[in-house]
Amino acid sequence: MPSEKDGAKKSLMQRLALKSRIAKETLSEFLGTFIMIVLGCSSIAQAVLSRERFGGIITINIGFASAVVMALYVTFGISGGHINPAVSFAMCAFGRMEWFKFPFYVGAQFLGAFVGAATVFGIYYDGLMAFAGGKLLVVGENATAFIFATYPAPFISTPGAFVDQVVSTMFLLLIVFAMFDSRNLGVPRGLEPVVIGLLIIVLSCSLGLNSGCAMNPARDLSPRLFTALAGWGFEVFTVGNNFWWIPVVGPMIGAFLGGLIYILFIQMHHSKLDPDMKAEPSENNLEKHELSVIM
């Protein structure tokens, strides 16, 4: 029989358990974004601070994509695993999530990314201090700011960088919309995070040169703000011809375009009753409209 101690623990857990659905989803988005930033940015830190003895561009791309996968497995069933304001915006814009949830999701994502960046800084503090003789640099061969946020390649123009962010995020959302379209091929239940991780790898390997393939305003702006406060200074906002706003605005536009393109080219043309498509059980479609992500 359960002891009084077990009963007391259960009672405490019940009292602490959140009853509000939006509160649960907000915590989920915070934790998921935190996980993504800690594991993803740490994969960059390990490569940079070891001067590529413990990694390089391949391990960074795989590491960050895998961080997204892990974050999704933690959050998918609770909040849909957006972990990206651009994804949440697209979900709301196309009626797949209620607008009142948007500020809760986005606030949690930005806060989770900021705390995640602070955690990476703490983990690799000694390495950061040793890397450039105690200096925290934004540019140059000993720069470390790009461990936390993306920066443009020297050759890219401001319009080029903006288009780069729009296009990369457009592909992200276009394919995510396809994955969760029950009238299309779809993905086996439970494997969605893995396929999204593969998508992140493809995008990073093909569209990462120009400006780092952020595709996520929270992933970029919150860590950038942290670095400004932690010792790199506000040069993180002025470098690259004031590049900072591009990974914030570009993904929002790209996410909307990606969803719109999929709907216009594919989804709106589904027959109401397609004999070649078998309807999925309602259990498998539960809240499928909210499921999606990004880096």
UniProtKB/Swiss-Prot annotation:
Keywords: Cell membrane, Membrane, Repeat, Transmembrane, Transmembrane helix, Transport. It comes from the Eukaryota. Residues 80-92, 211-225 dip into the membrane without crossing it. A motif (NPA 2) lies at residues 216-218. Signal peptide: none annotated. InterPro entries: Aquaporin-like (IPR023271), Aquaporin_9 (IPR015685), MIP (IPR000425), MIP/Aquaporin (IPR050363), MIP_CS (IPR022357). Detected in testis and liver. Detected in immature spermatocytes and in interstitial Leydig cells. GO terms for cellular component: basolateral plasma membrane; intracellular membrane-bounded organelle; membrane; plasma membrane. One of its GO terms (biological process) is canalicular bile acid transport. A motif (NPA 1) lies at residues 84-86. CDD domains: MIP. It catalyses: H2O(in) = H2O(out); glycerol(in) = glycerol(out); urea(in) = urea(out); (S)-lactate(in) = (S)-lactate(out). It is a multi-pass membrane protein. The chain crosses the membrane at residues 25-43, 58-77, 99-123, 161-178, 191-207, 244-264. Channel activity is inhibited by mercury ions and phloretin. Residues 44-57, 124-160, 208-210, 226-243 are extracellular. The keyword Flavoprotein does not apply. Residues 1-24, 78-79, 93-98, 179-190, 265-295 are cytoplasmic. It is found in: Cell membrane; Basolateral cell membrane. Homotetramer; each monomer provides an independent glycerol/water pore. Aquaglyceroporins form homotetrameric transmembrane channels, with each monomer independently mediating glycerol and water transport across the plasma membrane along their osmotic gradient. AQP9 is the primary route for glycerol uptake in hepatocytes, supporting hepatic gluconeogenesis. It exhibits broad specificity and may transport various small, non-charged solutes, including carbamides, polyols, purines, and pyrimidines. AQP9 may also facilitate hepatic urea extrusion. Belongs to the MIP/aquaporin (TC 1.A.8) family. NCBIfam families: MIP. This is Aquaporin-9. It comes from Rattus norvegicus (Rat).
